[in-house]
Amino acid sequence: MAAERGAGQQQSQEMMEVDRRVESEESGDEEGKKHGGGIVADLSQQSLKDGVERGAEDPEEEHELAVDMETISLDRDAEDVDLNHYRIGKIEGFEVLKKVKSLCLRQNLIKCIENLDELQSLRELDLYDNQIKKIENLEALTELEVLDISFNLLRNIEGIDKLTQLKKLFLVNNKINKIENISTLQQLQMLELGSNRIRAIENIDTLTNLESLFLGKNKITKLQNLDALSNLTVLSMQSNRLTKIEGLQNLVNLRELYLSHNGIEVIEGLENNNKLTMLDIASNRIKKIENISHLTELQEFWMNDNLLESWSDLDELKGARSLETVYLERNPLQKDPQYRRKVMLALPSVRQIDATFVRF
């Protein structure tokens, strides 16, 4: 994300995307874990240090001396500006950036979103890991496509209804308790609200272009109000309070479903989700593999940490000819001394059992 175009911009975009996969991991998205690869784990590690939630930091950090923007030299012709971890305390002096398209201000000491009205060419704004309590003063940025205000102190989703070109919105690890004020964001393709205090899926009926929805690590008790999201391909609901798989009948394009760390007892409600390639139901209370024989495109099936006892249940997966990875560890059937051999015999296409690759 250097001030120059070309290779610098490409590297910038790759770094920010990988960072966001780390964010997705925080919301319980195993896809983020698979692809994140730890490339930039150190960037988010500062926020996760000792498991301290934002808003309860060391008081001394609150009084860290901010840098005066006058001491920072800005390239007036830059299209990509990266001021990551500069100890900036106030957004000011950026009006000279007439050509800027991507502005990264992550890991600073910013408390208020302000003085950005002149940056009307801005497409991407990254405010990850600051001290922002309110989304405000963004109305002029009507061309914005990517907005990241993760790891801040937000309590409400507000002040973004004019950002109608927004395609990706990241509000991970805040204190948000309700999904609201996003009905005008009809171009949105990715919505990441993991690690908040949300109790219900609501107010997303107009987001018909949404492809990825991440709501892991919240307090949601029911899968509902998803009918309009027929273009959804990824749904992450890990670490919530779900007890039943339901409300997915219209998600006919769903390819990845993450439901681990809930209170689900029965595999059901997936009759119309024939395109699933990834199903994660680990760490629930499920005793039986059932109702998924029609999921013939499955490539990964994660059901570790459940109550599975019967080997015959694996027959339910035999139609998935492309199945390569299964996680079944910490189920009662793993106690069988022939555990790995029996999995291999039942599912000959599998190349990875739990964390270990199959040897031939």
UniProtKB/Swiss-Prot annotation:
<keyword id="KW-0597">Phosphoprotein</keyword>
<protein>
    <recommendedName>
        <fullName>Protein phosphatase 1 regulatory subunit 7</fullName>
    </recommendedName>
</protein>
<feature type="repeat" description="LRR 5">
    <location>
        <begin position="165"/>
        <end position="186"/>
    </location>
</feature>
<keyword id="KW-0433">Leucine-rich repeat</keyword>
<feature type="modified residue" description="Phosphoserine">
    <location>
        <position position="322"/>
    </location>
</feature>
<keyword id="KW-0677">Repeat</keyword>
<dbReference type="InterPro" id="IPR032675">
    <property type="entry name" value="LRR_dom_sf"/>
</dbReference>
<keyword id="KW-0539">Nucleus</keyword>
<feature type="repeat" description="LRR 11">
    <location>
        <begin position="297"/>
        <end position="318"/>
    </location>
</feature>
<feature type="repeat" description="LRR 4">
    <location>
        <begin position="143"/>
        <end position="164"/>
    </location>
</feature>
<dbReference type="GO" id="GO:0019888">
    <property type="term" value="F:protein phosphatase regulator activity"/>
</dbReference>
<dbReference type="InterPro" id="IPR003603">
    <property type="entry name" value="U2A'_phosphoprotein32A_C"/>
</dbReference>
<feature type="repeat" description="LRR 10">
    <location>
        <begin position="275"/>
        <end position="296"/>
    </location>
</feature>
<dbReference type="InterPro" id="IPR050576">
    <property type="entry name" value="Cilia_flagella_integrity"/>
</dbReference>
<dbReference type="InterPro" id="IPR003591">
    <property type="entry name" value="Leu-rich_rpt_typical-subtyp"/>
</dbReference>
<dbReference type="Pfam" id="PF12799">
    <property type="entry name" value="LRR_4"/>
</dbReference>
<comment type="subunit">
    <text>Interacts with PPP1CA, PPP1CB and PPP1CC/PPP1G.</text>
</comment>
<feature type="repeat" description="LRR 2">
    <location>
        <begin position="99"/>
        <end position="120"/>
    </location>
</feature>
<feature type="repeat" description="LRR 6">
    <location>
        <begin position="187"/>
        <end position="208"/>
    </location>
</feature>
<keyword id="KW-0007">Acetylation</keyword>
<dbReference type="GO" id="GO:0005634">
    <property type="term" value="C:nucleus"/>
</dbReference>
<feature type="domain" description="LRRCT">
    <location>
        <begin position="331"/>
        <end position="360"/>
    </location>
</feature>
<feature type="repeat" description="LRR 7">
    <location>
        <begin position="209"/>
        <end position="230"/>
    </location>
</feature>
<feature type="repeat" description="LRR 1">
    <location>
        <begin position="77"/>
        <end position="98"/>
    </location>
</feature>
<feature type="modified residue" description="Phosphoserine">
    <location>
        <position position="47"/>
    </location>
</feature>
<feature type="modified residue" description="Phosphoserine">
    <location>
        <position position="12"/>
    </location>
</feature>
<comment type="similarity">
    <text>Belongs to the SDS22 family.</text>
</comment>
<feature type="repeat" description="LRR 9">
    <location>
        <begin position="253"/>
        <end position="274"/>
    </location>
</feature>
<feature type="modified residue" description="Phosphoserine">
    <location>
        <position position="27"/>
    </location>
</feature>
<dbReference type="GO" id="GO:0007059">
    <property type="term" value="P:chromosome segregation"/>
</dbReference>
<feature type="region of interest" description="Disordered">
    <location>
        <begin position="1"/>
        <end position="63"/>
    </location>
</feature>
<feature type="repeat" description="LRR 8">
    <location>
        <begin position="231"/>
        <end position="252"/>
    </location>
</feature>
<comment type="function">
    <text>Regulatory subunit of protein phosphatase 1.</text>
</comment>
<dbReference type="InterPro" id="IPR001611">
    <property type="entry name" value="Leu-rich_rpt"/>
</dbReference>
<feature type="modified residue" description="N-acetylalanine">
    <location>
        <position position="2"/>
    </location>
</feature>
<feature type="modified residue" description="Phosphoserine">
    <location>
        <position position="24"/>
    </location>
</feature>
<feature type="repeat" description="LRR 3">
    <location>
        <begin position="121"/>
        <end position="142"/>
    </location>
</feature>
<feature type="compositionally biased region" description="Basic and acidic residues">
    <location>
        <begin position="17"/>
        <end position="34"/>
    </location>
</feature>
<dbReference type="InterPro" id="IPR025875">
    <property type="entry name" value="Leu-rich_rpt_4"/>
</dbReference>
<dbReference type="GO" id="GO:0005694">
    <property type="term" value="C:chromosome"/>
</dbReference>
<feature type="modified residue" description="Phosphoserine">
    <location>
        <position position="44"/>
    </location>
</feature>
<dbReference type="Pfam" id="PF14580">
    <property type="entry name" value="LRR_9"/>
</dbReference>
